[in-house]
Amino acid sequence: MTNKRQILVTSALPYANGAIHLGHMVETIQTDIWVRFQKMQGHDCTYVCADDAHGTAIMLRAEQLGVTAEEQIAKVKADHEADFKDFLIGFDNYHSTHSEENKALSHLIYERVKANGHIAERSITQAFDPEKNLFLADRYIKGTCPKCGAEDQYGDNCENCSATYSPMELKNPRSVISGATPVAKESVHYFFTLPEFTGYLKEWTRAGHLQDEVANKLAEWLDAGLQEWDISRDAPYFGFEIPGAPGKYFYVWLDAPIGYMASFKQLCDRTGKDFDEYWKADSNCELYHFIGKDIVNFHALFWPALLSDAGFRTPTKVCVHGFLTVDGKKMSKSRGTFINARTYLDHLQPEYLRYYYAAKLTGSVDDIDLNLEDFVQRVNSDLVGKVVNIASRTAKFVQKAGGALSANIINEELWQSFVKAGDVIAAHYENRDYSKAMREIMALADLANEFIAEQAPWALAKQEGNEQKVLDVCSLGINCFRAIMTYLKPVLPQTAVAAEEFLGTELTWTGPLSFLGEHTINKFKPLMTRIEGEKIEAMINDSKEATAAMAKTIAEPAADSPLAKEPIADEIEFADFAKVDLRVALIANAEHVEGADKLLRLTLDLGGETRNVFAGIKSAYLPEDLIGKHTIMVANLKPRKMKFGMSEGMVLAAGPGGKELYILEPHEGALPGMRVM
C-alpha cells in the first residue's frame, strides 16, 4: 500500500429549511462512497458536514410556524441526520453552522481579513418593510411592472416582458412578507474586496484544484471582472453579529463554508485530532470539498480567497457534480418525482439508490438521470441477478461438503483476472469515476456466472466421484463473490456486512486480494430482494401526497391547472397573429448578467444574423446547459433598452416560474432562421 494519507472531506451543507430529497443524495452518496473507499485503502479519511442554519428564510419560516429559529433548525437537523443515517452516510461528525465553534472561527477569519485591509464599508440603498422593520431582498417584493403593467412581478425583473428595474421602480410595490409598501432606506454594508484577489484566483483555479470544465467557466467570470462581495446583512437576521458592528450580521454565505472548519473543530475537540495540522497554510493533509455546480463561485472564488487571506490552507480539490433529473426531466412535485429521502426510504432499500447513482456518476459535472424503469431493471439485473446469484448458486454445495472452502484454485487465470482488476477499479474510485468502476465490477460478475454455468456444479454433483471438483468450482465461485463484494463495499456497506457474516471474514482492500481457502463459511441467507414495480408506483403516489400536505401546512393555495389559473385570452384575427414573427434560433452563447438575479444574456443565431436577448430564466437554467440548444424567439419585437444593455427579441418559455420554467424547443431538423407558423 502507498503511504497513509490524511484526508478531510466535506459535502455541501444542506439548508436547514426543508427536507432532504434525492437531489441532495447525489452528493452525499458520491462523497460517502469516496470516503469509504479511502478508509478501505487504509488512509486516515475524515468526513464532516453540518446544517447551513442561518438566514432570513429560516427566521421567517420559524415565525410562520410559531417557534424560535433555534427550535426550527434543531428539528430540521434531527430530520436531516436521520435521513442521512438511514441512507448509510458515514459522517464522522455532523454539526450546525449555528454553533460556538463556527461563531469563533467566523470572527477570527473576519478580523484577520479586516486587519489585512480587505473589508470595505459603504452605504447602499435598499427596500425596507416599515411594518416588519426588515430590509427586503428582491424576492420578497412584488408589484406591477413599470414597463408593461404586468401584475405580481418580483422586485428586479418582469417575467412577462423581461424588463429589469430596481424594486422601488415597481408600481404599487408590496412586501411579500407583510403586504406593506416598502420604502427606500440607506444602510452601511461590509464588503470583502474580492477583485483584489483576481490574480491569485487566476493562478489557483488553474493549479489542478478543479475539473477543467469548471476552471474554464471560472476563467470567463475572472476575465469579466469580479465584484466586491457583500458579506453583511441588517438586523433582524438570524446569524452571527459582526464584531464591532452592532445590528450587522454576517451574510449566510460568509459563515456557511466556515461551517466545514467548525464541524471539524468540534470533532477535534472530542477526539483529540489536531485542527491546525489540517488547516494551517502549509498543511500536508488533503482537503476535498464535494459540491454541486450551482455553488461553484462560492467555493472556487470567494472561499479560497478568504482562506488564503486569513492564513489558512485552501482546498486540495473542489469536486463538482451535476444536477439530478428524474425520467429525463427536472424533479417535479406535480408528477411526484420530487422525491424526499424519507419517502424513498419508506418504500425502498437505500443501497438500491446508492448503486444506481454509482452506476451513473463520473468525474465530470454532467447531470445524471434517475430513470425509474432503468433503475428497477439495473438493480434487479446487476445486484440480484448477477452478484448475489454467484453466492446463492454455489454456497449450498460448499455446505453439503462440510462448509469449508477448498484451497485449490481450479482456474488460476480466472482468479487472477479478479485480483488484477482491483488496481483498475481502485483508480476509478479515486477519480470519482464510479460508473467505470461499476462496469468493471459487473464484467467480473459476468465472468463468474459464465464460469459457474459452464462448470454446472449442480450437474457434476449428480455424478459420483465429482465431489472435489464440485467443491473446487464452488470455492472459486465464492472467492469471486468475495472479491466483487470487496470492490462493492464502498457502495453497498450494509450488504457487505451481511456478506462478511456469510463468509466469516472481513472484506478488506489494502492491496491485492488473496484466495480464501481451507476456510469455513456460514449458511447462506438471501442478501437482497428484487424491486417490484408496485413499490415505485407507491413511492410516486406518496410523493404527490406529501407535496399536497406540505402545501396545506404552509398555507399555500391549492394548485390549479394552468388553464384554470390563466384562461385562454380573447380571440384574435389571423392577421394579428401573423404580425408576430416567430423564428427558430440557436443559442450560440449564454452567460450570467452581473447584478441581475433572474436574467441570463443569450446570444441567438438566426442563421446569418445574431441577436442579444435578456431572458428571465436564470432560476431554471444554468448558462452552460443552454448553449447549443434550439429555441423559439419573437424576432420582430422592438428592441428594448434595459439596465444591462439592449434586448433584441424574446425567447418563449412556459411554466409557473422559479425552477419550473421550460424554454420551447423545436423538434430535430428545425434550422436557425426558420419561421414558426
Curated annotation (Swiss-Prot):
Motif 'HIGH' region location, chain numbering: 14-24
Binding site for ATP: K333
Cofactor binding summary note: Binds 1 zinc ion per subunit.
First-level EC class: ligase
GO MF, one annotated term: tRNA binding
Domain spans labelled tRNA-binding: 576-677
Pfam families assigned: Anticodon_3, tRNA-synt_1g, tRNA_bind
Binding positions (Zn(2+)): C145, C148, C158, C161
Chief subcellular location: cytoplasm
Catalysed reactions, as listed in the record: tRNA(Met) + L-methionine + ATP = L-methionyl-tRNA(Met) + AMP + diphosphate
Source superkingdom: Bacteria
EC number: 6.1.1.10
UniProt key word Cytoplasm: yes
UniProt motif 'KMSKS' region: location: 330-334
Compartment(s): Cytoplasm
Entry keywords, A to Z: Aminoacyl-tRNA synthetase, ATP-binding, Cytoplasm, Ligase, Metal-binding, Nucleotide-binding, Protein biosynthesis, RNA-binding, tRNA-binding, Zinc
GO biological process: methionyl-tRNA aminoacylation
Cofactor entry: Zn(2+)
Entry GO terms, CC: cytosol
Listed HAMAP family: Met_tRNA_synth_type1 (MF_00098)
Family per similarity comment: Belongs to the class-I aminoacyl-tRNA synthetase family. MetG type 1 subfamily.
Subunit structure: Homodimer.
Function: Is required not only for elongation of protein synthesis but also for the initiation of all mRNA translation through initiator tRNA(fMet) aminoacylation.
Protein name: Methionine--tRNA ligase
Organism: Saccharophagus degradans (strain 2-40 / ATCC 43961 / DSM 17024)
Lineage: Bacteria, Pseudomonadati, Pseudomonadota, Gammaproteobacteria, Cellvibrionales
Gene name, Swiss-Prot/TrEMBL: metG
